[in-house]
């Protein structure tokens, strides 16, 4: 399946289609968008965002704890869309602060 992904960035929202077997960060880059990242392996917080609508599968990541995920935080480098989804990007400071 392919879902609509909306990323709300400091520069404004961007929208694109993302297959459910492609990481959101990877697809964003394919579409020509630059987003923050570091490890690309789900083990840091550089790419952190916050899901405001929809659901993702980020079971490949291991950096976030259950409480952070329950609060909606997501690592876009290891997140697959599981529905149409809206994510606020550039949330590392909210996560670590």
Curated annotation (Swiss-Prot):
It comes from Solanum nigrum (Black nightshade). This is Ferredoxin. One of its GO terms (molecular function) is 2 iron, 2 sulfur cluster binding. GO terms for cellular component: chloroplast; chloroplast stroma. Keywords: 2Fe-2S, Chloroplast, Electron transport, Iron, Iron-sulfur, Metal-binding, Plastid, Transport. Residues 3-93 form the 2Fe-2S ferredoxin-type domain. One of its GO terms (biological process) is ferredoxin metabolic process. Its cofactor is [2Fe-2S] cluster.
